[in-house]
Amino acid sequence: MNAALPQEMQQHTYAIMDEVEGSHWWFVGRRAILESFLKGIVNRLESRLRAANSEAGPAKAGTPSLRILDVGCGTGANLEMLSQFGEAEGVDVSDDALEFCRMKGLKAQKGLAETLPYSDETFELTTALDVVEHLDDDVAGLKEMFRVTKRGGYSLIFVPAFMWLWGVQDDISNHRIRYTKKQIVSRLQEAGYTIERATYANLTFFAPILGGRVFMKLTGIKPESENNINVSALNGLFGKLFGAERIWLRNLNFPIGVSIVVVAKKG
């Protein structure tokens, strides 16, 4: 994603990313929502594995640890979260990002989303969390995720929503697109998936974010990064408010939001 930057700038960029992802309200709230979705997916996977092992006899009783792959793992914040659900590992194109993963003791290797360095049907669960929108060929990346996911396994996808919400952060992050729910669902189906659930997320801050981006476009104000906009006094509160959406999302699909979350299954 930052391959064209000088080495010192890449290291600085990923150092900022590592710090921001650990504490910024948006990432904290997103992880709370993702954990809720992951718990549901993992429960289904573990129930299926227990049933299969029970049929195989006492020698295979119990639930084996799930293998999980985080595509585009970056500096490892999501990989740390995923590790509580099984044997998680990551893949990323950036050596600098991978170095942060290794410093945290996380398993990660270099590779492209469009040509993942894994055998067919290796993982019970694969994730791409704000990654697919970076790809020149998003369907190719999703097909690779489908390939390395075991039959009966799941992929959890999180992407930004609506091109008319395009902002400075999209430019900084080298995004190619912001999706509608229909668009990302269509691409996942083209890759071979069955969609179990698709919903918008971050309804809580939809209006303020839309208003802020319209204001910046009208005034020409361009912050170095939207993550640098100072909300330090409210950071903890914002994280809790965003994360609280997980309660509503247990039973409701939001009709609109800043992001989209999709649970896709390999049948």
Q: Which positions does each model-derived feature cover?
A:
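C-terminal helical/coil "lid" or tail adjacent to the Rossmann-like core of SAM-dependent
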Residues: 205-239
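Short, glycine-/aromatic-enriched active-site segment of Class I SAM-dependent methyltransferases
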Residues: 15-19, 155-177, 181-189
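Core SAM-dependent methyltransferase catalytic element
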Residues: 213-217, 255-267
